[in-house]
Amino acid sequence: MKEFAGKVAVVTGAASGIGLAMAQRFADEGMNVVLADIETEPLAIAESTVKAKGGAVLAVRADMLREEDIFRLADAAFETFGNVHILCNNAGVAGRAAFGVPVWEVPLSDWDWVMGVNFMGVLHGVRAFVPRMLAKGEEGHIVNTASMAGLGTASGPYHVSKHGVVVLSEGLFKDFRAMGAKLSASVVCPGWVNTNILDAERNRPPELERTDLAKVAERARLTMQAAGESLKRGIPPEEVARQVFEAVRDDQFYVLPAPPESVDAVLTRAQGIVARRNPV
């Protein structure tokens, strides 16, 4: 895409972090923006912040775990603005109690929650928006937020979900090319970013609550403490948003806002696979 002024962007997980930064960047480029998030009060604050940039803003409370919420979001976006040109499937959760825990001990409630938001939320976003975007016949772009965790070696629902988003996005890009569509796609794989993703437990639905959270959290404490410190030292969300905007503008698929050592680890893993070395 080369023209952004007056076009429409939809961003999920838009009340904070990377999502809010992307929404602000799109507004700076003259776009109308649809903000979606599960948290009502932060969403209202984000709406005011983005409105101050100029352009029209629509805020929709939506839970990316719920297929019906995602289709309702698409309905609201198309009914309000007539079309959507950029869709950012960005909302995600970390499932902090599952970090540092052997994969066979992670309860299904964690898998259902993390995979439901991080992977199925992206898939439902594609299903809800892409057919309508294709039918409009205009230039557009899908941006799916994965993680460097989606390019590395690890276990647990977060890493598995992000690997899924990478592969889904690669397939989406190839599908668009094969049909000669005016749509394209990018996958964003950030390293450590200064966000509040580790606090996502507050949004876990009651039916997927953990009864053993205190016990598991203690086992994962050191892992989470290290992760929290890394997040604090991470790059600002605005830098991720800058790279995302440039990727949409330049039709670049892989967006890697991460330090060189993280990118090098991806190459090392790929070389290990080709050499048939065991994971490390």
List each language-model region with its residue ranges.
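Canonical Rossmann dinucleotide-binding motif of NAD(H)/NADP(H)-dependent dehydrogenases/reductases
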Residues: 2-34
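The beta1-alpha1 cofactor-binding region of Rossmann-like NAD(H)/NADP(H)-dependent oxidoreductases
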Residues: 40-41, 61-72, 108
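Substrate-binding pocket helix/loop in short-chain dehydrogenase/reductase
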Residues: 98-103, 107-112
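Active-site helix of classical SDR
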Residues: 126, 161-164
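A short, exposed helix-loop element centered on a Lys and neighboring polar residues
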Residues: 126-127, 170
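Residue(s) in the substrate-gating loop at a strand-loop-helix junction
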Residues: 147
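SDR active-site lid
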Residues: 177-255
